[in-house]
From Swiss-Prot:
Family assignment from sequence similarity: Belongs to the FAD-dependent glycerol-3-phosphate dehydrogenase family.
Gene Ontology CC terms, in alphabetical order: cytoplasm
Residues annotated to bind FAD: 37-65
Organism: Mycobacterium leprae (strain TN)
GO biological process, one term: glycerol metabolic process
Substrates-to-products reaction catalysed: a quinone + sn-glycerol 3-phosphate = dihydroxyacetone phosphate + a quinol
InterPro entries: DAO_C, DAO_C_sf, FAD-dep_OxRdtase, FAD/NAD-bd_sf, G3P_DH_FAD-dep
EC number: 1.1.5.3
Keyword Acetylation part of the UniProt annotation: no
Name of the protein in question: Glycerol-3-phosphate dehydrogenase
Cofactors demanded by this protein: FAD
Length: 585
């Protein structure tokens, strides 16, 4: 896919969607000198979706993120684009219908290179009532979202269920139901939404922290931002500011010095990652727990297992998993596995935070996953709550509210028809895998790996190796990835630090037992020429990354949130000028 919107050649020689060092410098200059229609705060999937929605309506958009794209909730989900089967029990039919429609849209049109169908087994444990009860729920699930490109449910005997999942205890089920949902690399998807927004003209910049809201009388007219890398400060003027910061919603709202229309309650969810051979199964699984459900999701050569659902009132940027969280996950899945998992089986662990709309319930698992849009003060729109899957609808609703402050007639949302970068041409390239592999001297499985991460942008990735063939070799201690992917991460995907690359552009930090430590220096050497790192810079980046991993691993042996949080907080920040938390000035 080529860029449709580009600046004059004298001003720009790289694609508008390429978030590299040159674009980052140019964005800073534009922020301080131009008037924008919409300023979006937050580089998660909802903020990126807001930027895309506004840009494709013809608005002039700035998107700022204090850390990295998808560095919060949007890289730490259960990796599913799903309707939320469990929400049917809470009678949230509208939410499930909306999410299923969005799932189908992304699977077939918007992001087929990123969102993939995934068969699930729902093991049945009660002989009389459970099968008709669950079958009715899944039947409703199959029908609610309209057209479907995945198969309908299939009922299985115990023997049939065990053929799909031989790793289950025979005594753990009496039968099962197979149904379909989808899986997605959430961080890559969010990044692609943001880059698609840039493709259509949005000015996107990471490491750009909002430290104040600009006011003119009773109206918000922009933001003051601080560069999280060097501490430089500038101001961005906009007709309207959209607060799409997820778990930081209340913090940004406080900058307005006005009471918000809703509050966000933060819930922590923990997942563990184990090698694929530790659980023998051809399908994903969903297990009922006392409070919610537990997912076992295939993820390349691994399984992702989770999640927990507990209140979190500590560091929002670096939520910590505890030994108690991990023990709970292992104990839950071991009730059904023929060969129990142990801590020694775990290659990776991650904790994420859910921004839930605060309610009367003390149980976060019962709080609504619906979203809300509010205008707490003129010129400021806030969007919070919701599910990852419904990001596009959330973004459209937020921009619908924002356009009231734009002094021009604005077109309605069209993102239902706008494929993400890499989608156009993906299916044709899938049919040409052997040809592309022969052309590049790569194994076909490598080409398929790249297509399922970059889609039709694969040519841009491989072009970086044209004059440096060594970039097509695997990263030595993370052979699932090629060196060229690291180079592309800093050339076109906005990565500024090793953590950005190893935890989000790639998923080395959860897929390898060393969590990226063993390959940090090799990757630093690959990206240093693009980022202008000196030998001293490389040493500092590697040391910072290693210290953060060490603190994270140690925190996962702690018995409670407070002690785990203290350990994580003891590690240095890669973004040395970040302010946490932002306070009123």
């Amino acid at each position: 896919m080529t860029d449709l919107i580009q600046a004059p050649e004298s001003e720009q020689t790289w694609p508008a969607s390429a978030l590299g060092p040159q674009q980052r410098a140019a964005a800073w200059e534009r922020f301080g000198t131009e008037q924008f229609d919409v300023v979006v705060i937050g580089g998660g999937v909802v903020g990126s979706g807001c930027a895309l929605d506004a840009a494709t309506r013809g608005l002039k958009v700035a998107l700022v993120e204090a850390r990295d794209l998808a560095s919060g909730t949007s890289s730490r989900s259960s990796k599913m684009f799903h309707g939320g089967l469990r929400y049917l029990e809470q009678l949230e039919f509208g939410l499930v219908r909306e999410a299923l429609y969005e799932r189908e849209l992304s699977l077939t049109t918007l992001a087929p290179h990123l969102v993939k169908p995934l068969p699930f087994l729902f093991p049945l444990t009660k002989r009389w009532w459970e099968r008709p009860y669950i079958a009715a729920g899944i039947f409703l699930y199959d029908r609610l979202g309209g057209a479907k490109s995945v198969p309908a449910q299939k009922h299985l005997t115990r023997a049939g269920a065990l053929r799909l999942s031989p790793g289950l205890k025979r005594s753990s089920l009496i039968g099962g139901i197979r149904y379909y949902d989808t899986v997605v690399d959430d961080a890559r998807h969010t990044l692609t939404v943001a880059r698609t927004a840039a493709h259509y003209g949005a000015v996107v910049r990471c490491s750009t922290q909002v430290v104040a809201l600009l006011r003119e009388g009773d109206r918000v007219i922009g933001v003051r931002v601080r560069d999280s890398e060097d501490g430089a400060v500038t101001e961005i003027r906009g007709h309207v500011v959209v607060n799409a910061t997820g778990v930081w919603t209340d913090e940004i709202q406080a900058l307005s010095k006005q009471r918000g229309r809703f509050q966000v309650r933060v819930s922590k969810g923990v997942h563990v990652v184990v090698p694929r051979d530790r659980i023998v199964s051809d399908v994903a699984m969903i297990l009922r727990t006392k409070k919610s459900v537990m997912f076992i999701i295939p993820w390349g050569n691994h399984w992702i297992i989770g999640t927990t659902d507990t209140d979190w009132n500590l560091d929002l940027a670096h939520p910590a998993a505890t030994k108690a969280d991990i023990d709970y996950i292992l104990q839950t899945v071991n009730t059904v596995l023929a060969t129990p998992l142990t801590h020694a089986d775990i290659d990776g662990v991650y904790a994420g935070l859910r921004p839930l709309l605060a309610g009367e319930s003390d149980d976060t698992s019962k709080l609504t996953r619906e979203h809300a849009v509010a205008v707490p003060v003129a010129g400021l729109v806030a969007i919070a709550g919701g599910k990852y899957t419904t990001y596009r609808v959330m973004a459209a609703d937020a921009i619908d509210a924002a356009v009231a402050f734009v002094p021009a007639r604005v077109a309605p949302s069209i993102t239902e028809k706008v494929g993400l970068l890499g989608a156009d041409g993906y299916f044709a390239l899938i049919n040409q895998v052997e040809h592309v592999a022969a052309l590049q001297g790569l194994h076909p499985y490598r080409v398929r790996h790249l297509l399922d991460r970059y889609g039709a942008l694969i040519g841009d990735v491989l072009a970086l190796a044209a004059e440096a063939p060594d970039l097509l070799s695997p990263i030595q201690e993370a052979p699932g990835y090629l060196k060229v992917e690291a180079r592309y991460a800093v050339t076109a995907e906005g990565a500024l630090h090793l953590e950005d690359i190893l935890a989000r552009r790639m998923r080395v930090s959860i897929e390898y037992p060393h969590r990226g430590v063993a390959c940090a220096r090799e990757v630093a050497d690959v990206v240093a020429p693009v980022l202008g790192w000196t030998a001293e810079d490389i040493d500092r980046e590697v040391a910072t990354y290693n210290a953060r991993v060490e603190a994270e691993v140690l925190s996962q042996a702690q018995p409670d949130d407070v002690s785990a949080d203290m350990l994580r907080a003891s590690a240095p920040e890669a973004r040395t000028k970040i302010i946490e938390p932002v306070s009123l000035t």
